[in-house]
């Protein structure tokens, strides 16, 4: 069951329309953060995940040829509580991708949305960026 959960996380990582038309290749992975006896931190491929564990989702893209800018969007699996993303310009959604904005500017009812409310992440890739990477930190619910 834990392995199926890990596979589901990887499958949900990226969903972006028309990436095939742009000549973009995406690779993605799910990693778990481990602490060493000396307090050091390292990540390793996630073979199984347990509640409370910190995970790192990594999405890398590469475009073989120049082209137009495009948007990559990533669903955050419900079983993960989003913490942060490595791209400052990334936008988040708290309503399944219907509306987008910066965390701290979105409202969930009468309160400002928190990282745990995030359901999706998206970012723009410009024509001058032939390759790149985004990492997402989350906690297993």
Feature map (PLM): residue ranges:
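Sec-dependent N-terminal signal peptides
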Residues: 4-13
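N-terminal signal peptide c-region/cleavage motif recognized by signal peptidases
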Residues: 15-17
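Exported/extracytosolic protein signature
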Residues: 19-141
């Amino acid at each position: 069951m834990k392995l199926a959960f890990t596979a589901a996380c990887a499958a949900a990582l990226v969903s972006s329309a028309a990436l095939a038309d742009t000549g973009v290749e995406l690779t993605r992975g799910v990693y778990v953060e481990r602490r060493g006896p000396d307090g050091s931190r390292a990540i390793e491929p996630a073979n199984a995940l347990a509640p409370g564990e910190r995970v790192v989702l990594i999405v890398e893209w590469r475009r073989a040829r120049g082209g137009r800018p495009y948007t990559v969007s990533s669903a955050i699996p419900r079983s993960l509580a989003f913490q942060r993303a490595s791209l400052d310009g990334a936008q988040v959604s708290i309503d399944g991708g219907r509306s987008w904005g910066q965390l701290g500017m979105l409202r969930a009812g009468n309160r400002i949305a928190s990282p745990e409310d995030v359901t999706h992440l998206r970012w723009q890739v410009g024509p001058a960026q032939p390759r790149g990477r985004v990492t997402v930190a989350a906690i297993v619910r």
